[in-house]
Design a protein with these regions (language model features):
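Short beta-strand scaffold positions
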Residues: 38-39, 74, 95, 114
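Conserved glycosyltransferase catalytic-site signature
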Residues: 7, 41, 97-101
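Short, well-ordered secondary-structure micro-motifs
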Residues: 50-52, 124-125
Length: 140
């Protein structure tokens, strides 16, 4: 099983967050399922902004090392085409969300987890389920 994590989940995992209990539940479920966590190169870019703004080379190195162990999905030509399809059919879909969903779609994932409940209403080819963190943490 492949589970795509949207950027906000990494923030909840690595920073002191009220969503910590939900993240722990999701991690426990993923371990039971022997799930592979995947994300896109956009996630890494988004996560590095704040540490770079604060000149925190230690956090840049820490995040980079963590992502070196993970499968990162590239925003390639196929993802760019899928991105355009998503944006053309879902007018309110923000560009970063469309980019993440396009990467997940072209890579083929079983579950896409985000904290944006609006995304969980979408059905995207190549993505089995889209769930908000609260819903994903309660999966059987």
């Amino acid at each position: 099983m492949r589970v795509f994590w949207d950027t906000n989940l990494f923030i909840y995992l690595w920073e002191d967050s009220p969503a910590g209990a939900r993240m722990n539940a999701l991690l426990a479920w993923q371990e039971e399922q022997n799930a592979e966590v995947v994300t896109s190169t956009l996630t890494l870019g988004e996560l590095l902004v704040r540490p770079m703004q604060r000149q925190r080379a230690d956090l840049v190195a820490q995040y980079s090392a963590a992502f070196a162990q993970m499968h990162l999905i590239e925003f390639d030509r196929a993802a760019a085409f899928r991105f355009a399809q998503l944006r053309s059919t879902h007018a309110t879909l923000a560009a970063p969300d469309a980019a993440q969903l396009a990467c997940a779609s072209t890579a083929g994932v079983d579950l896409f987890v985000t904290n944006d409940r609006r995304l969980s209403r979408l059905q995207i080819a190549g993505v089995g389920l889209i769930r908000a963190l609260a819903e994903a943490a309660a999966l059987p």
